[in-house]
Amino acid sequence: MNTETLSDISDEIKSHYPTMLQSWGIIGISILFKVLFTPVFFLSDYTGKEQTFLVYQVLALGSTFAYAHLRRKKTTGISTYDFNPASTKIMVLLAVSTICLLVSIRVPLVSVLPRPEWLPDLSKTFTVNNPYSIVSLVLVAPVLEELIFRGIILDGLLHKYSPVKSIVFSSMLFGLIHIHPIQLVSAFLIGLFAGWVYYRTSKISLCIFIHFINNFLITLVVLFYTDDTSTDTLAATGYRHYLIYLFILMAVGGVAIYLLNKEFNTQGRNTASFSSPSRMSNLNEQTK
């Protein structure tokens, strides 16, 4: 017999953070911190641009996470995140899925959506042999951004809204903070994948791993190739050959995601921890 009452579930759902409106508030706070810490770049003449960007990333993203984390803790009493690793099989499937998704999306986007002139060319901003740029893009960004967008925003939304609405909305916000048109689209799609993985596992560690693979590959491309190089390479390869190449990548990625889904089903989902609207609907039916 189900002893859970409508009042119990209603109170539980109200206690979670954030709502969609509050999620927009987190984005606003993020923009505010980015503006407030902009003067840090004046130090680049003394410390170097890579070191300065690393400090800026830590301050801006770290402050945003601290704000959202404290709000979440105050509202829900929750202050922990699941950093437990997954099996080697899952990690390999995640890596393959992410690589296929990234390559099949980014190369055609580069040829269709060239970098706007008002945006800086990162290949001229960072040097490949500088460890600070690698730490900024491959370590700091994946950890802090995933804690914000999956660990806090998506986690809170999943307790209030349907999984599809929660994942799409949080991914849209994740895409919007990446100003570059190519990054916006690819970040949205990677966000959908990471969001689905988080919904199935509740493990922030897996989302960080996906983001790490994504940023690591993008960093290599940005540091070794320009946008023009990518476009020329696509033209030289031939669009027919590229379509075959794209189909193979999508097929491999699709198989990897299928196997990943089977693995999640085998190991059991953690989705029961989320208070979905379906629970409210079912309970309403029981109380009629």
Located regions from the model:
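Juxtamembrane helix-loop-helix connectors linking adjacent transmembrane helices
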Residues: 76-143, 155, 159, 232, ...
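Short, Lys/Arg-rich, polar N-terminal cytosolic tail immediately upstream
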Residues: 1-17
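Membrane-interface helix/loop boundary segments of multi-pass membrane proteins
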Residues: 144-169, 196-203
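Functionally important transmembrane alpha-helices
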Residues: 33-40, 183-239
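Residues that define the loop-to-transmembrane-helix transition and helix capping
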Residues: 132, 164-165, 182, 204-205
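Hydrophobic core of alpha-helical transmembrane segments in multi-pass integral membrane proteins
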Residues: 29-35, 58-69, 95-107, 243-264
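C-terminal membrane module of polytopic membrane proteins
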Residues: 212-288
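Alpha-helical transmembrane segments in multi-pass membrane proteins
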Residues: 24-72, 90
